[in-house]
A protein has these predicted regions:
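C-terminal motif of bacterial Sec signal peptides marking the signal peptidase cleavage site
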Residues: 15-18
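Hydrophobic alpha-helical targeting segments used for export or membrane insertion
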Residues: 9-13, 414
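Sec-dependent signal peptide recognition
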Residues: 2-10
Length: 414
C-alpha cells in the first residue's frame, strides 16, 4: 500500500530527433523504467516466519505501541518486536518476516498488518511469539513495492491478467527502453503515438504516519483513494463494504472523537464516523502539493507539510487548524519548518520530527514558536508516539526514547 507515481519520462532520458519528408517530426526516446519482479502466490503466502533472532532496526517504518511492546515495520520486510517495559533499556525481542509489510494496527491481542495484496493477522497474547492466524487474500489489489530509484513503472506489466497470473510483485528491476514518437504538424507537437510509461477493548497506539486505524470494532485501511472497512468483532476480520472511494489519495489516518482526519498530498480531509460502515465526508483544508500527517487534540489539528518526498514540492510547514466546527475548519496559523515529518501530542505538549525532535507547549497556538521547550538534533526523526510520559521516536538510524515527565528538565534518550 504505497504511493506510486507515473511519469512519461524518467530521470534517464535521451532524445534523438529527425524529420521525414512529409513533415512528420520523429523522436527516438530512451528512458529508464522499473519492470516488476514476481514471486509465486504459494511461495509468497508461505513465507511468513517468526524468529527470536535480533534483527537490527536499519530502516524507519510505521510504529504501534501495545501493552509495553513496540512494533516497528521494516518496510517490505517485516515487523520488529521491541520489549519496552523498561524504556531506558529497550530490548529487541523478535522479528516477524512478512514480505510487503508497511502498516499495522493492534486490538485485543490481535496484530493486523498488510503483506502487499493481503491483510494478515497474528495472535500476540504472547508478544514475543506471535502466531499467524490467517489472511484476507487480495484485500489490497493495487499494492506494489516501494520505488526508491525515482523511475516510473510499467503499469501493464503489474496489473494485466497475464501479470496477475505470475503471482505477486515483490521488487523492481530497472530497464532502459527505446521508443519512437511521431509528431504530426496538423495535430500539434504534443501528440504522442505511444505512452512511454503510463502507467472495551485494548487497542494499540499508532504513530501519525499510519494508514491503518481502528475505531470501535472496525479496522479502516486506505490504499491511495480507496478505503476498506473490516469488522474485527468475530474470529477473523471481515470486509464489510465495497470499496469506499475518497476524494483524494490518502496517506495518513487519525481518529479524534467520532471523526477521522486524513492527510493527503493536497490537504486534510475530515470524515464523520457516526455510521462506522459509511464514513461521510464533512470538509477539507487544502494546501500546496505536499505530504502530510495530522494529529488532533482539544479541537486543534496539527498538520505538517514537507519537501524532499515523492510529492514533489519545496514547502515545509506546520499548520494549526481549528476543527471545533468540523464543517468549517479554520486555518489559524502556519509556521515555517526545515523538513517536518511525523508528530504527536499529549496533554498540550507537541512533539515534532523536524531537524531531529522539537517539543512545544501549545497553550497559545499563535505564539507556538516562542514556546519551544527543547530541540534535540543529530538524528532524522520520522514518527513519534507519546504515551504516559515516554516519547518513542523512530528515526533513520533506529529507535529513540525520551522521558517527558519533567518538561523543564532534560529528556533522556533510551
Amino acid at each position: 500500500m504505497r504511493k506510486l507515481f507515473y511519469w512519461a519520462f524518467a530521470f534517464s532520458l535521451c532524445v534523438l530527433m529527425g524529420c521525414k519528408d512529409d513533415g512528420v517530426r520523429v523522436e527516438v526516446v530512451r528512458y529508464a523504467i522499473n519492470e516488476p519482479v514476481f514471486m509465486s502466490i504459494s511461495e509468497f503466502r508461505n513465507s511468513v516466519k517468526v524468529t527470536d533472532e535480533v534483527v537490527p532496526i536499519t530502516k524507519r517504518g510505521k510504529i504501534c505501541f501495545y501493552k509495553d511492546y513496540l512494533y516497528i515495520s521494516s518496510p517490505d520486510k517485516g515487523i520488529h518486536i521491541v520489549d519496552n517495559r523498561n524504556p531506558a533499556s529497550p530490548r529487541i525481542a523478535g522479528f516477524v518476516e512478512l514480505i510487503g509489510n508497511e502498516d499495522l494496527s493492534i486490538k485485543d491481542d490481535k496484530l493486523y498488518a498488510d503483506s502487499y495484496v493481503d491483510l494478515v493477522w497474528f495472535d500476540i497474547s504472547d508478544p514475543e511469539r506471535p502466531e499467524l492466524e490467517g489472511r484476507v487474500e487480495n484485500a489490497f489489489r493495487y499494492a506494489l513495492p516501494t520505488i526508491e530509484n525515482g523511475y516510473g513503472f510499467d503499469y501493464n506489466m503489474c496489473y494485466s491478467e497475464e501479470a496477475r497470473a505470475k503471482g505477486v510483485v515483490v521488487g523492481w528491476e530497472p530497464k532502459e527502453r527505446e521508443e519512437t514518437i511521431y509528431h504530426y504538424p496538423s495535430y500539434g507537437d504534443d501528440l504522442m503515438a505511444n505512452d512511454a510509461a503510463s502507467g472495551t477493548s485494548t487497542q494499540g497506539v499508532n504513530g501519525s504516519m499510519a494508514r491503518f486505524s481502528i475505531y470501535g470494532k472496525y479496522l479502516y485501511t486506505v490504499e491511495q483513494n480507496i478505503m476498506c472497512v473490516f469488522d474485527l468483532s468475530g474470529d477473523k476480520p471481515v470486509l464489510t463494504t465495497n470499496d469506499i472511494w475518497l476524494q483524494r489519495g490518502v496517506e495518513t489516518l487519525f481518529n479524534y472523537k467520532d471523526k477521522m482526519f486524513m492527510g493527503t498530498p493536497t490537504g486534510m480531509l475530515i470524515y464523520s464516523l457516526e455510521d462506522p460502515l459509511a464514513p461521510k465526508y464533512r470538509s477539507s483544508v487544502s494546501h500546496v502539493f505536499g505530504c502530510d500527517p495530522v494529529v488532533v487534540e482539544d479541537d486543534l489539528a496539527y498538520v505538517t507539510v514537507h519537501s524532499g518526498n515523492t510529492c514533489g514540492q519545496n514547502t515545509n510547514e506546520l499548520m494549526l487548524i481549528d476543527v471545533s466546527d468540523v464543517d468549517q475548519p479554520n486555518l489559524l496559523v502556519t509556521y515555517g519548518m526545515k523538513c517536518p515529518k511525523g508528530l504527536g501530542i499529549d496533554n498540550g505538549t507537541l512533539f515534532l520530527c523536524d531537524e531531529g525532535l522539537k517539543v512545544f507547549n501549545t497553550k497559545d497556538p499563535m505564539t507556538l514558536m516562542a514556546n519551544q521547550l527543547v530541540h534535540y538534533a543529530g538524528m532524522e526523526g520520522y514518527d513519534v508516539i507519546p504515551f504516559k510520559n515516554t516519547l518513542m521516536m523512530i528515526a533513520d538510524d533506529g529507535l529513540y526514547q525520551y522521558d517527558y515527565s519533567n518538561l523543564q528538565g532534560c529528556f533522556t534518550r533510551a
